[in-house]
Swiss-Prot record:
It is a single-pass membrane protein. One of its GO terms (biological process) is secondary metabolic process. Its EC number is 1.-.-.-. Its cofactor is heme. It is found in: Membrane. Pathway: Mycotoxin biosynthesis. PANTHER family: CYTOCHROME P450. It is an enzyme of class 1 (oxidoreductase). This is Cytochrome P450 monooxygenase ATR4.
Length: 524
């Protein structure tokens, strides 16, 4: 080519291209494809006519709005709720479009079956199951079935088992400081105890005491989130290339391999007990093995189910219990109220599990239950705790069309704190439910308890797909809180105050470095 016939700029470009290696050409090409993919985005379904909300200006590119939803979802949703709470609106993300629906639609969708609107698939899709080995949990409802069919009907039995494991865990894992105030990183302490309890109920011994299992059960959530975060840096069409190269994913696989060996031993114990005619249903793994399909029965699938259970239960329960303690330290006048109630229940009914089964004993703690319900109301584990994936096209009574494949959510936290609904809802009122239970002529005594679902308490979801393990979680939290209040005093370190809840996307988080001052007061 006669370069002298071209202009100087064109000459430089051609000379530069001639000098490039294949790597030098591939990297800019890949970057261009990445930018185009993110700029254009996949056409995720949206409710017809619903406006896209969150742009800072009419000139802001969509990929910038989508990027802001990772750390700015709370602010975008808050402003959208204020302006558009009575109509559907859309918050776009790189991985989906979230269709925010008005609260008025809750009653209409609450009983829709999961083959039409599915909440389970929304939860697990946030962990990119295809690339975090969680696909068996996405394809199966075995975990939900064991909670609804085994755990809940036998809740009293499993709460009693929890009491025994909690006794053991407190003796071995909780520090003793005599009567001197000591600053303690207490969140890892309660996380470990909760992990032991979960493993005892679901896997049994010896797995619940296996240090490798405790580490993996605690860490699998963070590991899967790390893989997901790494993958979200790339367009979805590149994930099959990127995923095998991620160090975070290789680390997760190594942990899964270790977990499989632990679960395999528990499966062997189950099989040997069957051969010996010693069928034992103390663990939920036993029920799962007896009621699973051939596809669900593999060691890897059962291990994934156990990891998914840990993901769905340990960190959420820890988050809720930590928030209760933080609320109490922010309002220390409520410590003596709860301790007086505990002392009275012990005076009348003895220690937990001695004269009454643990579940019935915990039901006597009405003031504690009310305080817990209030903290759960104001500090849900998900900003949009009610979500669905539309597996079929749905038309609502007012003509609103929900397209197949659309992801739906409700601004549940904003609704339960909306001053236009009730001017008192934004304030922490620990006896709110206690007063409601004791209003009237006794007809409300079994209502307004922690874990029950209504339009004022949406932290566990809503309708027929609300969290199936919520009643066990509530009993677990109350039991641990009772033990902590009987044995320890708490306060914030000098100069510290209540840590704020913050959100990464829709997921609620606490400062993991937040500590408390603790000291022994008495021994159970």
């Amino acid at each position: 080519m006669r370069l002298d016939l071209l202009g100087p700029v064109a000459t430089r470009i051609i000379t530069y291209l001639d000098s490039l290696t294949w790597v030098g050409m591939a990297l800019p090409l890949f970057s261009l494809c990445w930018a185009i993919s993110y700029a254009r985005g996949k056409a995720y379904p949206t409710v017809p006519g619903a406006p896209v909300y969150g742009y800072n200006s009419r000139f802001e590119p969509s990929f910038m709005l989508k990027s802001r939803t990772y750390t700015g979802f709370y602010d975008i949703l808050s402003n959208g709720y204020k302006m558009l709470k009575d109509v559907p609106f859309v918050i776009p993300r790189h991985d989906t479009n979230i269709n925010i629906l008005p609260i008025k639609y809750l009653d209409e969708i609450r009983l829709m079956p999961k083959h039409i609107l599915n909440s389970h698939l929304v939860l697990i899709s946030q962990m990119t199951p295809k690339w975090t080995w969680l696909q068996p949990a996405a394809d199966s409802d075995l975990v939900t079935r064991v909670l609804l069919t085994k755990l809940n009907p036998d809740l009293q039995k499993y709460v009693d088992i929890t009491r025994l494991e909690l006794d053991s865990a407190f003796k071995s894992d909780f520090p003793r400081h005599d009567e001197e105030w000591t600053e303690v990183d207490f969140q890892p302490l309660i996380r470990r105890v909760l992990t032991r309890i979960s493993a005892k109920i679901f896997l049994g011994e010896p797995a619940c005491l296996n240090e490798d299992w405790l580490r993996i059960a605690i860490g699998y959530t963070a590991g899967a989130l790390e893989v997901t975060k790494d993958l979200h840096k790339f367009p979805s069409w590149t994930h099959f290339l990127v995923a095998p190269l991620l160090p975070s994913r290789r680390r997760l696989r190594r942990e899964l391999d270790i977990a499989m060996k632990i679960v395999e031993k528990q499966i062997q114990l189950h099989e040997q007990a069957e051969k010996d005619g010693l069928k034992n249903y103390d663990t939920l793994l036993d029920w799962m093995l007896d009621n699973c399909s051939d596809k669900e029965s593999s060691v890897e699938a059962m291990t994934i189910f156990q990891c998914f259970i840990a993901m769905a239960s340990i960190h959420t329960t820890e988050f809720s219990l930590a928030n209760v303690l933080f609320d109490l330290c922010a309002h220390p006048e409520w410590f003596p109220v709860l301790r007086e109630e505990l002392d009275e229940v012990i005076r009348v009914h003895g220690n937990i599990g001695h004269r009454l089964p643990a579940k019935q004993w915990l039901q006597k703690l009405e003031k504690m239950d009310s305080l817990l319900a209030e903290t759960l109301r104001l500090c849900p584990t998900m900003l949009t705790s009610i979500q669905r994936l539309a597996l079929e096209k749905v038309q609502l009574k007012d003509g609103t069309v929900i397209p197949k494949g659309s992801r739906l959510a409700w601004a549940s936290l904003h609704h339960v704190t909306d001053p236009e609904v009730d001017g008192t809802l934004a304030a922490w009122d620990p006896m709110r439910n206690y007063r409601k239970r004791h209003s009237g002529s006794g007809e409300n005594l079994t209502k307004f308890v922690a874990g029950q679902i209504n339009e004022s308490t949406l932290g566990f979801g809503y309708g027929n797909q609300a969290c199936p393990g919520r009643y066990f979680a509530v009993n677990e939290i109350k039991m641990m809180l009772a033990r902590l209040l009987l044995e320890f005093e708490f306060k914030f370190p000098e100069g510290k105050s209540r840590p704020k809840v913050f959100f990464i996307g829709e997921i609620a988080c606490l400062d993991h470095d937040a500590t408390l001052m603790m000291r022994n007061v008495r021994t159970c």
